[in-house]
């Protein structure tokens, strides 16, 4: 995206909340495919079949968000979150116990790739400053979230043994912070997550430590860092595959009669023009 750092790795786009990258990704994958994946990850809320879902146009509860994010920590296995796992009587006898229903929705390599990319949020992105201020030094994958009027803030934090989500907001959207400086997820929700995790780490009986690390799947081949330094902007020439970026083709001799007939949505994004996502 021109004016936003040129070509960006997905890890960096997530780390710095570069939303046009998310829009382009859904444009390439197709909104219907993204919605189907969300359904596989336990999301039941209504989702519009257009590119606005990249910007958070759907009202998804923190409950369903956490179920989806925890799938990445479980290496592709979705486990429906439960409010109550076990009920015991006064003598400790188990009256009822919920057995988790585990469903594989993606392979471990893809799930870990998401973990790898979201680690940038905590390491050097939107969550890094607050985590450092709180003295939390652990392997964390996460994502901050903020509504455009600063009335809602989120942070989903994934550690190797625990996924936790925090939402701060109001039922009445007219109530909000004056600025994103105070109203962003990294300032509203992340501190709550941090205080909670410090309590978790302090309780040794839980077996959760800041020294825990994510285990890489055996078939995980690494990242796309070899693409850095190739030059150009992500919006030059429209959407391209990795092979097309590595091995660009020479432009063909075209009369260009239809070049401007259907203007690419990415050009509008780069010029900050209004977009009709229902076309």
Please identify what each model-predicted range represents.
Residues 218-279:
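Low-complexity, Gly/Ser/Thr/Pro-rich intrinsically disordered linker/tail segments
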Residues 40, 130-132, 251:
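Bimodal feature
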Residues 28-30, 107, 276:
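Poly-acidic low-complexity segments
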Residues 44-54, 190, 194-196, 237:
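Repeat-unit-sized solenoid/scaffold elements
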Residues 1-74, 117-120:
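Active-site-adjacent helix/loop patches that line small-molecule binding or acyl-intermediate pockets
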Residues 12-16, 61-62, 66-67, 71-226, ...:
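A penicillin-recognizing enzyme superfamily signal
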């Amino acid at each position: 995206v021109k004016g936003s750092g040129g070509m960006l790795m997905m890890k960096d786009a997530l780390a710095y909340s570069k939303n046009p990258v998310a829009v382009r990704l859904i444009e390439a994958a197709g909104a219907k495919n993204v919605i189907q994946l969300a359904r596989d990850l336990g999301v039941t809320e209504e989702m519009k079949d257009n590119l606005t879902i990249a910007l958070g146009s759907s009202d998804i509860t923190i409950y369903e968000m956490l179920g989806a994010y925890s799938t990445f920590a479980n290496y592709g296995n979705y486990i429906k979150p439960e409010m109550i796992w076990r009920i015991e009587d006064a003598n400790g006898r188990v009256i009822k116990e919920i057995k988790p229903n585990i469903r594989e929705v993606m392979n471990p390599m893809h799930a870990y790739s998401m973990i790898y990319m979201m680690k940038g949020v905590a390491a050097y992105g939107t969550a890094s400053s607050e985590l450092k201020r709180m003295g939390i030094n652990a392997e964390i994958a996460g994502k901050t979230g903020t509504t455009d009027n600063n009335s809602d803030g989120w942070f989903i934090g994934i550690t190797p043994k625990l996924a936790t989500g925090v939402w701060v907001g109001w039922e009445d959207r007219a109530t909000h912070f004056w600025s994103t400086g105070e109203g962003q997820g990294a300032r509203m929700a992340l501190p709550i997550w941090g205080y909670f995790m410090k309590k978790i780490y302090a309780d040794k009986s839980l077996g959760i430590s800041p020294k825990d690390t994510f285990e890489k799947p055996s078939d995980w081949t690494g990242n796309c860092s070899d693409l850095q330094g190739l030059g150009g902007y992500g919006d030059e020439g429209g959407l391209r595959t990795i092979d097309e970026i590595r091995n660009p083709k020479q432009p063909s001799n075209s009369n260009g009669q239809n070049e401007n007939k259907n203007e690419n949505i990415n050009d509008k994004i780069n010029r900050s023009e209004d977009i009709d996502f229902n076309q």
